[in-house]
Amino acid sequence: NTASIAAVGVAFGEYFGYFVSIPAGGVQMVAVISIILLTAINVAGVKSGVWTQNILTIVKVGMFGGVILLGVFLPGTESLNLLKNSGGASSLGAMGMALIAIMWTYDAWIEISYVAGEIKDPGRNIPKASLLSMVVIIAIYVLANGVFISALSIEKMAGSTLVASDAAEVYLGSAGASIIALAILICTLGANNANVLTSARITYAMAKEKLFFRSVAKVHPKTETPATALLIQGIWATILTFTGSFNQLITYMVFASWIFYGMSAGAVIILRHQKPDMERPYRVWGYPWVPAIFILFAAWLTVNTILEAPRDAAIGIGLILTGLPFYFFWSSRKGSNEAD
């Protein structure tokens, strides 16, 4: 998730460059400043982080709503063909790589579980919030992409780094492009604020389980936030900001994440067999077919990434492997303490 924070920070830097001329390496520096700012907001208190998130989410939904309305009331310059296929033997592999970015845009589906301990009636509210948010997000993304394609064509979209702004320019000229670029700039802050807010809870939970430094499990005496976990997360995200482009960073992140997502789905099946009587506040719908299909998809996505982007996959695997010695070290310490 720190790779995701770094990636969104880089995206913020790229859109910032739409308004201000940035020298070489400046995108990463802008990304670092945005990460520091959001980390400070979330250290200051949960309420400040949540209020920031609510405001930025309203702006984000409003921006996408505006883009969708452009497509409804103004004619596009391209014919809308959602079934267009370039063909070729490598189409399946290329589709898998395209899915990397798509799965990243939907990756927040899991992040609500990171703050489950701070949610009232999580057994009821988490599934409800997850389902509702996914339906809304899918509708917004599909409609917005239809507008983008009708304005730019798939080929032009593939060659653009500022798709929403370029689409707005087709409809409204340079003024419209600037407005959308500003809205996207705010949207990236909103997305990253959600990442910063939720992801630090993983490190915090690990420390509470005695799988990391105990000091990380402490909350700030005044703000009652996991300040140390937030600071560690911010430092690591800052370092990752300088390790690659936006596309490379999300490839590291999605590749590594889906290995664990697949393993988590496998754990559902294993636990159903090993502990059939265990209390389950939430039971997987469509068991065992839904987790089985999920596992197959996760396996295909990770294998395809290895074949199509071996360098990025190797870095993702390397990031996982660097964490294993620390995990085994803390696990052994936890076992020793419990034995004592």
Regions found by a protein language model. Give the residues of each.
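Helix-loop-helix junctions that connect adjacent transmembrane segments
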Residues: 23-29, 55-182, 312
